[in-house]
Amino acid sequence: MKFDYKKYFINVSSFILYLFPASLILSTFLSNLFVTIISLSFLFYIILRKTKLPENIFFKLFIIFWLYLILRSLFAENIFFSVRSSFFYIRYIFFSFAIIFIIENNKYFLKNFLKIFLVTLSILLIDSFIQFLFGTNITGISAKNLEDGRISGLFGKELVLGSFISKIIFLLLSVFCLTKINYQKSIFLGTFFFSVIVVLISGDRSPFFITILLSLILLTLLKSFKLKTKIIFSLFLVSSILFTIYSSQVIRDRVIKHTASQLINDSSSEIKIHKLNIFSKGHEAHYIAAYKMFKDNIIFGQGPNMFRLLCKKNEYYVEPQSCSTHPHNYYIQLLAETGLIGFSFLMALFLFIAGNLLFKKLSNFGILISLSLMLNLFPLIPTGNFFNSWVANLYFLSFAFYIYGIKTKLLFK
């Protein structure tokens, strides 16, 4: 009997993708392993079947971007360190197109993926509420042992709960629109509501504020719900947010007082307006250091992932807080490390997504998956490292569904 690699690849990769959301919570190593297995298996399938590489404009542009990263790394001050970040970045585009291939060839994938994804998120949300209400989650992690008494849920000591939920919630809701399940609207609204509340109690302020902003856009554009339902839901959500903030001293201090104190550098007993900071004193120092690197090589930058090595140099040093593994903003990082050329790829992608959302008639799926990517790539908030694998795992998952929507025309009405 002839071995059917296509069937084998689809079945194994589908199973891995069902577990992928959980792997993002439990282990960065595991999620990276899953991405590598799927991308290499898909590449092997292409070679084995002697099929053409995806003839898609996004695929071609990504390859050009990747080749540029490799080339720039070869001229970086620390070639090995820079190449190590850029060379393996290629796996993400094969990961995204493997997902598209699986969706198209496994008619049960979307429903199974949605159900398992929903169960995974529900467990995470319940655990987070337990930690918030009782101080300790189901794995024994106490909020008292975390910074400012924040909530981390199943992420343990990693304070990324709010960031994770904000990045996946619109993706999950978009998959709702591709499937038909019983009580879809009730589950949709319930998942959305509890996710926003957990982002709030996590203490992750940037994800919370951007989630609220995009939620307003969502409720404005979404056509599935009557105006009355939208108004009632919005009032209930706002009331719940205000109640949560003012009933918890920890959240109130974190969301309101801490935000104000970081935005305003109060070095004396009086608050002086001329000492306003960009997000915080530390963030501003990162951005200034990155700007110095950008000015030093406007077109090509300093090389992928080189910020952490160069920020200690006298010509880029600002103050002790200015040096970090990355400048905490994707766009500023790409300007510093890849110059205007690398920056233009990401900015063009964001403007393309935003342009479609603003000027074209999108389906409910199109609206949600667009918001998912915009939240992942929003330029005006602090972010992680652009070349960080955990971060890339998240936005290339959303990217796969976005390309699928364009390819099948499900993105548009």
Whereabouts are the PLM-identified features?
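Long extracytoplasmic/lumenal interhelical loops at the membrane interface
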Residues: 270-338
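Membrane-embedded alpha-helical segments of multi-pass membrane proteins
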Residues: 16, 26-48, 86-98, 160-169, ...
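A membrane-periplasm/extracellular boundary helix in multi-pass inner-membrane enzymes
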Residues: 126, 222-273, 288-296, 304
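Loop-to-helix entry and N-terminal half of a specific, functionally important transmembrane alpha helix
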Residues: 12-20, 57-63, 187, 191-193, ...
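Transmembrane signal-anchor hairpin modules in multi-pass inner-membrane enzymes, especially those
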Residues: 1-84, 101-111, 115-118, 175-186, ...
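Alpha-helical transmembrane segments of multi-pass inner-membrane proteins
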Residues: 20-21, 66, 70, 94, ...
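Selective detector of the "anchor" transmembrane alpha-helix that sits immediately C-terminal
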Residues: 337-362, 396
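Transmembrane alpha-helices of multi-pass inner-membrane enzymes
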Residues: 37-43, 215-216, 349-350, 369-381, ...
